Amino acid sequence: DSNNRHKLKDLFKKKDDEKYKNFMPWWMPSQWTAIAADYCYGETINSAVYKNKGSGANAVEWKTEIPKDGYYEVSIWNAKMSGRMFFMDRRRGRHKEERNQTYTIQYDKEKESVTLDLDEETEGWVSIGNFYLPQGEVIITLTDKVSGDYVIADAVKFTATEE
């Protein structure tokens, strides 16, 4: 009997989930959710992931291989929605929301953390800082432990510098 149910279930095509959702400030997902929007970074698809704030147990990581030892400026894409969310801010009785997000840079056996208030930064590339990075794997981590209502994880870039 369970075999018949399994065969019947296989006849029905499962609905394909959409890869990208719309950002809905009145409903924040509890898990990382992909969004596509004009304020996100992308060459083909402007996309990012977002979720509601949490305890820090959920994180996203960006991994890259640094080709040679040297100084690198590490930047993140600030998908800024403050102006777009003004109507929500007015309804909540505030005009600005602090968006502190802490990025952790791991390389070799080193770990450094940098906290940015992304509401104070412009939309686009924002520097986390300049770091001397050895050749090899570098990991940037962003957790869901933030001061605002939500966290957005978009793009990270590494630019070789003189110092």
Language-model segments: residues:
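Extracytoplasmic
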Residues: 1-163
